[in-house]
Amino acid sequence: RDRMDTIVTGHYARVVYDEASGRYLLKKGLDNSKDQSYVLYNLTQEQLAHTQFPVGELSKHEVREIAEANGFINADKPDSQDICFVPDGDYAGFIERYTGKTSRTGAFLNTAGEPIGTHRGVIHYTIGQRKGLGISAPHPLYVCGICPEQNTVTLGGSQDLFSRRLTATDVNLISCDSLEKPVRVQAKIRYRHPEQPATAWCTPDGVLHVEFDEPQRAITCGQAVVLYDGETVVGGGRISSAEKS
């Protein structure tokens, strides 16, 4: 590590040095359909200064053409749709193997906190999930809350999935030093989710607050919220709470 000046990765993103602010900026890749800036929001100024994303200036088609021209055996490899280290899509199984712990059954609760059934283990569920619950009800039920500490999963109607505000911790800002005053941004709450207009600010305790113009469906604790100003990543954090609307 001490002998390297730069690390080069294949992420679809760009790094630009802004002379006016004296900061390195993280920008979206030019191929918006492949942009990966969302997963890079926690890079520091020091890391950005020594990182290059050459494919960020290219489309996926152009990358394939270059790979084919240079005889790469994977030039025509289909795009991956899953996490690269979980190729079979069995996320719960991966967590069990990685942690060495098996998931425990627990209580399904309704929105009043009353038990209505038994779940297979919290790692098998995600906010907004409808299929595979094994619960019969006169109306569709969705996962609207997960509490690992209590080993409970809360089920509710579609109206219970919407939140207008969230907070986030482990905040990293890239384009600025602070967000003491509210600023207008485009906020993204998951990798494939369209950015949404919002207002964002940080409180003195370092917590990021985001208020959306319109309620958002299935804001999920533990996921990243990433803020954009056009093509530039302002920063982001790990979602710690969502206020139901």
PLM region descriptions:
Residues 1-233, 237-245:
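Nucleotide-activated chemistry modules centered on ATP-dependent adenylation/adenylyltransferase
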